[in-house]
């Protein structure tokens, strides 16, 4: 690789200008046009075209477009310019729009080394202070990775407001390491900066930790979370300038407190207030028959007018969703919590865990699934109300993320569900009653699948129709049968097991 570099390696803008020439090209184009390849293009193509391996494309650009050897040290890729190259996929969402295809891995965490407590002296900062983001579209119809199109190339500096949150995230992670609790780290601990598991099978890639010789921990890396990178993708790379979302907290507030603390401060002052009193205090005139009545009240309690979580800047970046948990009066338990309706055709098309891989060759089919996006990539702000004779009283809130061990149980249930759908859902008909073999609440203790439709209706491939609804109440199965529209639900008992005791109504 002795060819002269077609960019100034000391100038970030020069590197960016050269990178922008990639836009519209495929990775095969890069290989075909490379001035650095000393071997036959066919030989090089074979290394990167495995349809299961979604990684390696960043290495291809490093070597055959930018002309430098791949490095894995803590220095930036373009060290003379202080620029880190990050090549990553984006995908189309099932419901339209686009999302980051993966979290953005920054650097491995070495649990055996002394921890750097100053974020600005850490390897993480070296890897993220100035990044050249190159995004390609992961088109599921394309089988050869080299045929993916590169669509975006842009320098990115993390905004100062976000840095306050990231520094707090860093502190949360290193505090656990210093306490000898690296084995207890979870991505759910933090907002924007995560500590994701690494290794072909994370459960087998256990490493020792300096601060606790008795317990091994899963190998992990610092990363920018999928929810954060999805926001960067949509509001920065895909937009001429950053799209404004509703602001939850000011930069000054975030310098003094974490998002979690600000949420608690804003909501806790309403504890033991009746919902009517809260609405009156906030000047709200909302029809109580509105199914989103409490959710609207909670948003105003938080100081935002947006009902949609993804339109609140910090909630969008941290993947926070507000959910109202209501304990019924007269000794009735709170309800199961609906997460999202299921599209069975899309679920069937989702790859199994070992059918998709990241840059390092790790299985990520599960992490690319819709159910993981709902439960693994999100935090939930539970706003708890207790019903009484006069309506409902606010009892407090809890910011929650599903523990890693529970996500593993959900992963196993997701795999079983996909197998059932692929083999054909089994139905048992008894008059107008139709039962199926989809996930039951007793099977994993966390979630289940059950109907979410106004009316029940089934239409089977033999022409049989059962129920008092119509086609609009159904979803199509890969077999051709139509089933009453189904949804993922969190079990009521599981929600109770995760809530703080002061929020639970004991009977």
Show where each model-derived region lies.
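Nucleic-acid endonuclease domains
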Residues: 1-79, 87-507
């Amino acid at each position: 690789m002795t060819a002269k570099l077609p960019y100034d390696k000391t100038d970030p803008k020069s590197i960016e200008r050269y990178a922008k020439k990639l836009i519209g090209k495929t990775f095969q184009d890069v290989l075909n046009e490379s001035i650095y390849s000393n071997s036959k293009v066919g030989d090089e193509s074979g290394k990167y075209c495995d349809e299961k391996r979604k990684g390696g494309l960043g290495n291809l650009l490093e070597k055959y477009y930018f002309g430098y050897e791949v490095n894995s040290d803590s220095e930036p890729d373009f060290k003379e310019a202080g620029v880190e190259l990050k090549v990553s996929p984006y995908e189309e969402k099932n419901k339209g729009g686009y999302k980051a295809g993966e979290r953005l891995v920054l650097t491995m965490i070495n649990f055996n080394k002394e921890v750097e407590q100053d974020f600005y002296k850490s390897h993480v900062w070296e890897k993220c202070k100035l990044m050249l983001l190159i995004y390609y579209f992961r088109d599921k119809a394309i089988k050869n990775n080299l045929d993916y199109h590169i669509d975006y190339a842009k320098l990115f500096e993390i905004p100062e407001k976000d840095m306050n949150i990231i520094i707090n995230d860093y502190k949360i992670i290193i505090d656990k390491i210093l306490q000898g609790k690296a084995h207890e780290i979870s991505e759910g601990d933090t907002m924007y900066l995560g500590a994701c598991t690494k290794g072909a099978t994370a459960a087998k890639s256990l490493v020792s930790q300096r601060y606790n010789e008795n317990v091994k921990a899963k190998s992990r890396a610092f990363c920018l979370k999928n929810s954060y990178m999805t926001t960067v993708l949509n509001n920065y790379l895909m937009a001429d300038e950053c799209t404004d979302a509703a602001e939850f907290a000011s930069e000054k507030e975030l310098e003094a407190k974490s998002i979690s603390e600000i949420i608690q401060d804003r909501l806790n002052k309403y504890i033991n207030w009746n919902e009517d009193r809260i609405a009156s205090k906030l000047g709200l005139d909302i029809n109580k028959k509105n199914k989103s009545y409490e959710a609207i009240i909670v948003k105003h309690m938080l100081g935002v007018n947006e009902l949609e979580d993804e339109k609140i800047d910090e909630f969008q970046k941290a993947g926070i969703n507000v959910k109202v948990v209501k304990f019924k009066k007269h000794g009735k338990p709170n309800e199961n919590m609906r997460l999202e309706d299921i599209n069975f055709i899309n679920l069937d098309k989702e790859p199994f865990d070992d059918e998709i891989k990241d840059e390092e060759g790790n299985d990520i089919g599960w992490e690319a699934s819709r159910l993981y996006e709902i439960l693994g990539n999100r935090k939930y702000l539970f706003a708890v109300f207790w019903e009484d004779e006069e309506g409902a009283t606010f009892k407090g809130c809890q910011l929650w993320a599903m523990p890693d061990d529970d996500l593993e149980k959900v992963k196993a249930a997701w795999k079983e569900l996909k197998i059932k759908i692929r083999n054909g859902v089994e139905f048992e008909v008894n008059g107008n009653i139709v039962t199926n073999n989809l996930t039951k609440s007793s099977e994993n203790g966390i979630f289940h699948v059950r109907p979410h439709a106004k009316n029940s209706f089934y239409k089977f491939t033999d022409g049989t129709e059962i129920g008092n609804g119509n086609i609009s109440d159904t979803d199509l199965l890969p077999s051709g049968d139509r089933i009453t529209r189904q949804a993922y639900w969190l079990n009521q008992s599981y929600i109770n097991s995760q809530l703080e005791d002061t929020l639970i109504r004991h009977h």
